[in-house]
């Protein structure tokens, strides 16, 4: 019984840490995912990284639409990660190109990513911008939902009725 309580405490603490450091788990709405997927132009073999992937809903949507694209997500909140791992196990043939990792989004190197998703709270942007310096390929697209990155001009802004705005940046802004 004590093991169960310790396990639950660890899961809750990981959720609290994720919420305080970047964002609480809040899955992207299906309509928001569809709108964004309709804009993506991915080629076989390209790589998508989701920093703060939660339950992987965005990665699984990308994998369904682009089955030849490699999708990797990072998060530190255990409950959504367990859901993502379970989904991957249940549908392993469909999601063989999806990789879900326990890891701090601020410590990931995105040099090999063609697209980097950042769907977080704006309060973490200063730390995020510092952590991504030199870790994003110049030709990558960095896709940010809801709030623009401070003091940076997006290459493109996507707006649709009833959906959160999406800001698309090029990786060159992280090179300086």
Task: Indicate where each model-derived feature is located.
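C-terminal substrate-binding/active-site "lid" region of AdoMet-derived donor-dependent transferases
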Residues: 124-176
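Conserved class I S-adenosyl-L-methionine
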Residues: 44-54
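A short SAM/SAH-binding and catalytic strip from SAM-dependent methyltransferases
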Residues: 113-127
């Amino acid at each position: 019984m004590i093991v169960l309580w310790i396990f639950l405490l660890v899961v809750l603490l990981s959720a609290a840490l994720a919420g305080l450091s970047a964002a609480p788990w809040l899955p992207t709405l299906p309509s928001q995912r569809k709108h964004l997927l309709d804009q993506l132009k991915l080629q076989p073999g390209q790589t998508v990284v989701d920093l703060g992937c939660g339950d992987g809903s965005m990665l699984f949507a990308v994998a369904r639409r682009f089955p030849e694209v490699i999708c990797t997500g990072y998060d530190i909140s255990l409950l959504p990660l367990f859901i993502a791992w379970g989904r991957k196990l249940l549908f392993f043939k469909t999601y063989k190109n999806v990789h879900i990792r326990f890891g701090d989004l601020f410590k990931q190197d995105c040099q090999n990513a063609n697209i980097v998703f950042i769907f977080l709270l704006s309060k973490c942007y200063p730390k995020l911008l510092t952590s991504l310096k030199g870790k994003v390929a110049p030709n990558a697209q960095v896709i940010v939902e809801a709030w623009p990155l401070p003091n940076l001009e997006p290459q493109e802004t996507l707006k649709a009725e009833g959906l959160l705005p999406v800001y698309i940046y090029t990786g060159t802004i992280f090179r300086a």
